[in-house]
Amino acid sequence: MKIRVMTAVLAAKFVGYVCKKIGRQGVTWAGKVAIKICPDILEQLSSQVRKAIFATCGTNGKTTTNNMLCAALEAEGQKVICNHTGSNMLNGVVAAFVLAAKWNGKIDADYACIEADEASTRHIFPRIKPDYMLLTNLFRDQLDRYGEIDITMNILEEMMRKVPKMQIIVNGDDALSAYLAMDSGNSYVTYGISKPVIKSAANEIREGRFCKCCGEKLEYRFYHYSQLGDYYCPKCGFARPKLNFDAEDVKVGDQLSFNVEGKHIVANYKGFYNVYNILAAYAGVRTAGFYGKHFEDMLSKFNPENGRMEQFRIKGTGVTLNLAKNPAGFNQNISAVMQDQSPKDIIIAINDNAQDGTDISWLWDVDFDLLGNSTVKSITVSGIRCQDMRLRLKYVDIPSILEGDVEKAIRDRVEDGVGNLYVLVNYTALFSTRNILKKLEGEK
């Protein structure tokens, strides 16, 4: 078996190297090759992690939260394996381990931080048996792949019961996620924001409006956004649990700040949703037994990358790239963009490949009317479904420029724009757009 593990590791490393050389995303291919050679390669490698394995799940915020947790643990002097690129299905998780292994199949890691696609947890969790599951939120996403949220919840509930020793670190402000943790029988800790911070849009789409315990409509003392907030059931008493890690005195603007456990956290990020990402990572490192004394220093150096509010500079134009793949995430993206009061151009690129979900009807649940602001100087629509995106904007009387070629759209805005460009893309548009931006940034 040792020979098979070594062969799988070497073959995967070779495949990853070749793919990188020819400019391809070789991560998942490396994992696929490793499993083909050694079907139990993930069990063999993950069992060598010395202290604990974290699995990060949830609709939005997985990649940022997981990478931030990894950076926080490394700041505490720990050696960590992490699927940084966000390849979160089985092949991507396997690749994270085989590419971190030495040629002889040995792993040198105190922790593993693994982002896991919710539907893929059935293939991942039985193999790695996480010690902690960090659950960020549950929103409607890719209806043609996941179906209704209840299907995703059933999968996660099944995994919680199959790994009974796994502790859940859960967003207590999300009634759906909190119910799962509270009903699972697993031990859990919660994080959240106990007091209102910003006014939530009255017409915002909200999931999980009914109590999972008794079916009664939930009442809210206030909303943060979407269904996140202070909820309770007037019939059975189900309510937001007591928050173990509570972000207080939250400030949102050009940077974010809040207090938690007496620490003042400041981060140079935009977007209220990032308070949750930061708080989740903090809860993770604290639950692992660290006091988080290096957390603030880590934040000052942390670069989200991977298209999560990633910054580029192209011929004097500041470009911000961000992923927006469902109504809740897109609304928060728009909110973050509109916090910038300076003139701006926006490019929206929408694809409908299998990994995106071919059903793009969710675009009609996004509050695009908020982009009808004098600071928005132009909106360009691009990607495979650019015509659909243009129609969506037309229905809220927002004019747009049609340019199916993403690279040309970016070049045009860099040449003729106001010097401040936001590029909002869904999943399969992300990696190609990021490569375009990196290429353009490197041009003289």
Predicted regions and their residues:
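Short glycine/threonine-rich catalytic loop with a Thr-x-Gly-x-Asp
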Residues: 203-209, 269-280, 306-307
